């Protein structure tokens, strides 16, 4: 997939961060997990009862979404199929986020990408 222009990437990343925000809020409610979701610009912060956080933000120069969680730091790039995948493990973004959120909330949370 050829690189996007910066404005194309920013629009795509903005839409994806909004989508993640909505999906996390819905999944947390369904799982009865206490997760505070806050968005400031291109940074989405998930805060848990124990004070830990997951931070998701867009990195326009790299055309990636970066995730910082207790499990580590991860970079996700959009593939030809439109899915965001980890640049190292190739794990899909929503599968990975489900695991990170479940680990930090001590509640089984599954994010539905669709």
Curated annotation (Swiss-Prot):
Pfam families reported for this sequence: Frataxin_Cyay
**GO biological process annotation, one example:** iron-sulfur cluster assembly
- Provide the alphabetized UniProt keywords: Iron, Metal-binding
Which cellular component, as a GO term, is one annotated location?
cytosol
**One Gene Ontology MF term:** ferrous iron binding
Does the record bear Cytoplasm in its keywords? no
Fetch the InterPro entries from UniProt: CyaY, Frataxin/CyaY, Frataxin/CyaY_sf, Frataxin_CS
UniProt xrefs under SMART domains = Frataxin_Cyay
Q: Which PROSITE patterns match?
A: FRATAXIN_1, FRATAXIN_2
In the UniProt record, does the keyword GTP-binding occur? no
Family affiliation? Belongs to the frataxin family.
Function in brief: Involved in iron-sulfur (Fe-S) cluster assembly. May act as a regulator of Fe-S biogenesis.
Q: What is this protein called?
A: Iron-sulfur cluster assembly protein CyaY
Which organism does this sequence originate in? Ralstonia pickettii (strain 12J)
Quote the gene name from the UniProt entry: cyaY
